[in-house]
Amino acid sequence: MGILDGKRILVTGVLTDSSIAFHVARLAQQEGADVVLTGFGRLSLVERIARRLPGPPPVLELDVTDEGHLGSLAERVSAHTDRLDGVVHGIAFAPQSALGGNFLNTQWADVATAVQVSAYSLKALAMAALPLMDGGGAIVGLDFDASVAWPAYDWMGVAKAGLESCARYLARDLGPRGIRVNLVAAGPVRTMAAKSIPGFADFEELWPKRAPLGWDITDPQPPARACVALLSDWFPATTGEIVHADGGAHAVGG
């Protein structure tokens, strides 16, 4: 028996098979869960990637900035399962002008995009899934340490700080419904999304040196396993928490 036996999990944010969300979906299936994926934009690509999972799951289109997509999500998911026990938020995006050392000159429209897609979408996704979570469950989001100002991360760092605050407020308001809300702050992993961040090479060099446990930037397993653990029943009284799966780098000075 796996720790997710019988659970139904919605996983967002799969872009390629290097995505942390992909490995969350794979591990969730291996631990007994039924999985539904969402994709944005190039849906056929996500469908091809989904076929690499142990059991190819259904893939639904979801643009978290589209009220129509959000409003119909529960109905579309219910075509495949009558409930959700867990939701994984693996969605983040910032325009290039909001990254790479341009912090002081970034225009509000680009800041707003980063915050809406990377932070507000946690609340939007939670509310969209809520009709299928009458029995309680777990919402887990993927995070990156927002306690300091990282080189080149700029407005994405601000958005991640917003994500962390959003998770705490959701934990407060969804707790009475039996829904736990937690984040996993991953160390840098060489994904397609990460490669688009200017200065990511600096993280690749810095992190293994800082992390007391070491850090492999090619291995998405540590954060994926943390997500699966939080989706399980093994943390029944944990909510509003940020679990760092980063080799311990967050705990030590530079």
Predicted stretch roles:
Residues Y120, L183, D202-T238, V243-G247:
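C-terminal helical subdomain
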Residues A28, L174, L230:
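Aromatic pocket-lining residues of Rossmann-like dinucleotide-binding sites
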Residues V11, V88, V140, V181-V184, ...:
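Hydrophobic structural elements of the Rossmann-like NAD(P)H-binding subdomain
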Residues G13-I20, F93-M127, G135-P176, P188-T191, ...:
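Catalytic loop of short-chain dehydrogenase/reductase
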Residues E31, G135-G136, P176-I179, D233-W234:
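Short coil/turn segments at alpha/beta junctions that flank glycine-rich nucleotide-binding fingerprints
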Residues G2-L37:
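Canonical Rossmann dinucleotide-binding motif of NAD(H)/NADP(H)-dependent dehydrogenases/reductases
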Residues P54, L60-G71, E75-A79, G86-A112, ...:
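Conserved mid-core segment of classical short-chain dehydrogenase/reductases
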Residues E47, P176, P188-P212, P222, ...:
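A glycine/serine/threonine-rich, flexible loop-to-helix segment
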